[in-house]
Amino acid sequence: MTAVIVVLHAEDVALEFVSVLRDHADQDVLVVVGQARASVTLPAGLSLRERLELLGPMVEPGGNTAELPVPSDVAALLGEAPGEIWTHSPADHRIRRARFGWIVSRAVAPFSPSPASSPSSPTVTCSVGDNPFLQTIPGTATAITAAEAEAKIDFINRRAGELLRSRVADRLVTTDRVPAVERFFTVSAVQANRLYALISSLGDDAAVADDPWEFGRSAYEAARLDATAAWTARWCSPQDGPIVEVGACQGELTRRLAGKGYRVQATEPNVGFRARLAERAEPGVEVLPDSLEDLADHGERQAAAYLLVEMLYYDQDLTLLDRLPTDLVLIALETGQLNERVWPWLREQSTWRVAERVELAPPTLESVCDGLAYLRKRGSRGLVLARAGWRR
């Protein structure tokens, strides 16, 4: 059966998959290019430069906004079942490549949520790609030769030179995106789903996997959530009235608060997360679709406190807090975001005073996705904001 390399852009073969062409020098290799929705066969027996040259007409140095193919489109381009398949990492920091790698995994083995599919789903081999925030453990790492490096350089300079000065960040060819060691790892469809959800943390696709941040599995996250619940209890009691948890995700903090006797109005705009939150909600929990903007605009949900825990990463207008119907707002964020966004705003306003600052969880390194990768968890610090004139 034919070996297949499935990439979003034609130049990606030269950037990340030259060692695959070397390993299949005596076999035809099918290359599927998602952006062009086309394929080309690189015949056996040709030199690396000759093979790469066949991809030249498919290089499109333009923008990065074309609609991505869906899994059925990719499956049609693959034709009969491939023997081996290589593609992008679903955890690539270049989000369109990550999404395309995820799409390929779904095209090869349609995702099934049943536990039985997890250990035996068909696999694809992914290039580690580009991600400064997540280290994926490679199954193989292959150094290219000087001649292969020259072939890469020549192809990019002649066929994709515009990408060396692209203003589109994901298309820009930088030195680190032309690796001398090509690294690959193998994933099942279920693992691809989890990696893609993790890297999509600021978008709606974060909900494609259950518990993408592993709140229910991570020792770090459990300690952080326990500390956050205890911190909340120090500032308001269940007898003070309901509390509003903004951006409750799937309800790990919600569950802890409900267990302490609080009436929690848990809001979650993401449809997927909200469905899981509602399914698992305990007595005393009301699940709502409101965003921070909705809550501020409507001003209807009077509460003892509003909890904004690890959710101010979406460039929300912080003046919205002024319109929340409460005298107490508890914010938890990593230190960098507090320093860059929250503290400058606090210094310029007079509606709120800082009643407490506290470390809820220190930074740590932690494995994710069952040891497939690891990353730095950035820690969490809490700020209690009390409306001017409020006293305990």
What are these regions (language model features)?
Residues 220-238:
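Conserved alpha-helix/loop element of class I SAM-dependent methyltransferases that forms part
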